[in-house]
């Protein structure tokens, strides 16, 4: 049984603890996949399909593993990133939320949610009416993990966090799987509000994610965010450095802030089921 992560430890020690916990999670996932998919050995497949080169066989095997992963509905469960017992502030990250997970967040007092995959209309806006009417969805936009977040989004996120800290609110953000877009934003939060360095933030992002090698641009993006936090010029170019854009093109209000409540503008007929 894993011990809960101690919040009183320095950030470096907490990161090391999280990496060990993430490795346990990886091993559990590998065992689950091994039980869900039975793959024949390469030699057997090569005999049946002698025309297939080795890389095709590897791709077939990988595709089978991915199919098993999707079938298991694998997404990161809600995880507390930071909290302040004195004020009541808390921040959670997650993958796509089930009804039970959303209900648990509500029970813990989460008041506002930022959705990074643009899927709130078909999920949270529907589920909130059933079990958690007090939670507000402040942002709902499909960010692209292959492109850097904008300066306007970061400014809106900073304002959201600072208001939440000042008022002692509990906040959460999610993407679809909880590894890439949510991982990048967590890295930014840790550097901006917890004093972590880029290397430390990247280590935790990688430790808590799966299929991170498929998104090699995330590490240099986080390094660029670290330069921004440190007040240094971004040296990575437009591919990784946050750029200034029209706020509305990033799902923000024209004033460059998060909306009051995305779901308030959705009727039953507008909800995608």
Residue spans for each PLM region:
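Cys-dependent protein tyrosine phosphatase-like superfamily
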Residues: 2-10, 14, 18-29, 33, ...
């Amino acid at each position: 049984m894993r011990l809960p992560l101690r919040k009183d430890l320095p950030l470096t020690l907490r990161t090391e603890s999280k990496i060990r916990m993430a490795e346990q999670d990886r091993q559990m996932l590998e065992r689950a996949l091994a039980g869900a998919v039975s793959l024949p050995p390469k030699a057997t497949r090569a005999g049946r399909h002698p025309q297939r080169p080795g890389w095709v066989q590897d791709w077939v095997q990988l595709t089978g593993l991915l199919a098993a992963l999707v079938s298991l509905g694998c997404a990161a469960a809600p995880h507390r990133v930071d909290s302040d017992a004195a004020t009541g502030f808390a921040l959670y990250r997650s993958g796509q939320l089930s009804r039970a997970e959303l209900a648990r967040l509500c029970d813990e007092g989460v008041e506002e949610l930022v959705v990074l995959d643009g899927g709130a209309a078909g999920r949270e806006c529907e589920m909130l009416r059933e079990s958690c009417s007090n939670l507000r969805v402040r942002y709902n936009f499909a960010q692209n993990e292959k492109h850097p977040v904008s300066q306007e989004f970061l400014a809106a996120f900073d304002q959201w966090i600072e208001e939440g800290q000042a008022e002692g609110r509990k906040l959460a953000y999610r993407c679809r799987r909880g590894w890439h877009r949510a991982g990048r934003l967590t890295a930014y939060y840790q550097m901006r509000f917890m004093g972590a360095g880029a290397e430390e933030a990247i280590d935790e992002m990688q430790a808590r994610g799966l299929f991170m090698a498929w998104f090699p641009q995330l590490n240099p993006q986080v390094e660029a965010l670290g330069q921004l936090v440190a007040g240094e010029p971004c040296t990575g170019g437009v591919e990784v450095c946050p750029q200034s854009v029209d706020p509305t093109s990033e799902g923000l209000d024209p004033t460059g802030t998060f909306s009051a409540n995305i779901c308030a503008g959705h009727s039953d007929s507008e909800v995608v089921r």
